[in-house]
Curated annotation (Swiss-Prot):
Belongs to the KptA/TPT1 family. This is Probable RNA 2'-phosphotransferase. Keywords: NAD, Transferase. GO terms for molecular function: NAD+ poly-ADP-ribosyltransferase activity; tRNA 2'-phosphotransferase activity. Pfam families: PTS_2-RNA. It comes from Pyrobaculum aerophilum (strain ATCC 51768 / DSM 7523 / JCM 9630 / CIP 104966 / NBRC 100827 / IM2).
Amino acid sequence: MNDVYKCPVCGQLTESPTHCGVSAVKILDGAMRLKISKLLSLALRHSPSVLGLSLDKGGWADVKTALEGLRKAGIRADYEALYAVVALDEKGRFELKDGKIRARYGHTIDVEVEYEADSESKVLYHGTSRHLLPSIMAQGLLPMRRRYVHLSPDFATACQNARRRPLPVVIEIDAECLRARGYVVYAASGKVRLAKHVPPECLKKVVDCPTPS
């Protein structure tokens, strides 16, 4: 992950070392940003006890407790660092509100997060590995241990996800097909869409991810 800077003129957080025509102040290095993000994902999605958290029904945890948990894990993070991780996350993984923090999606634990329905997207994408295609084409996309299937609104994001595995490919999905079969498509963030299941008949085609230049 990139370093995070704060502009001394306007106060905006940025990944650029310059802003408003002046040098910005580095407040968080990329390595620490990644560590915080990974620990928050683990605790808020799967295992709250990792940071000593207690989640309510909506998946919210106390920010002060989260910061204390990070410190006990050897990460000296203050609220500004935590806010930077949340605010600059390109996939909108986290949410801060009224002294609480939660993961927006990706849970394997039993929480209830309300999402707005996406009624506009016509095509969605899912990044995966070519060797998984036979089972996907037979069963469709299943949430597995998660509560929802994760989909992307654009090809590039799906490819980015697919490249975590060997032989990355992207499956193109007919979103109207999903709706016609009674499946709601939810917008979890600007970069993430969710559905309970994607049946085989809604899978349109498979495209290889291009090699990054």
